[in-house]
Amino acid sequence: MLTRFRALYEKLSIPFGKASLKLRLTPNFWTLFSLFAALLGMFAFGAARYWLGLLMIVVMNLADMLDGATARAGNLGTAFGSVLDHCTDRYGEFMLVAGLMINGAVSPLLGMFAASGIVMASYVRAKAESMGGIKSCVVGLAGRQEKLILLVLAVIFFGVGWDLPAQIMIALVGLISHITFVQRLLYTRSKILEKPAT
């Protein structure tokens, strides 16, 4: 849904990337910093410190924005950087959900439903683009930002003691992630049909 605004977002983030370059900070620095913020978020959620965890989500997203902006501003994008960014994003998302499971706010069943959906929606896209010869498989009901918005809402609800709405938000994260997985799988099939795997 929000991917349609990606071009505008990338253009507006360039000045921040230039500022990062002046500080001699690399895209991979921001990628790893994003993962570190997610790790702190997991510990915060594990201790039921929801507002601190929410702050870490904001920091994580700012760092994620800066890694791409820095790469574009300095023409520093690499294949390895892209893979590293993709992997740390998934680790980060899993850590945040894991933190909510650690403190018991989210049941293991619901947490794994959400986490597995997040991972599989991303995995099918990666395989479609690497093995299916598809230039872009950014299709489906929800991308990363939509899922993070729902996660943020869940954290806010937990923070004010509204557990049921929070649980619903986590369930929606899982539901839209699994729907996106199916949509991407069907899209991939329609593109490659019976093309032999390589």
Where are these regions (language model features)?
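Conserved G/P- and acidic residue-centered "switch" motifs that form tight phosphate/ATP-binding loops
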Residues: 64, 85, 180
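Alpha-helical transmembrane segments in multi-pass membrane proteins
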Residues: 60-63, 89
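Basic, amphipathic juxtamembrane/active-site segments
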Residues: 68-110
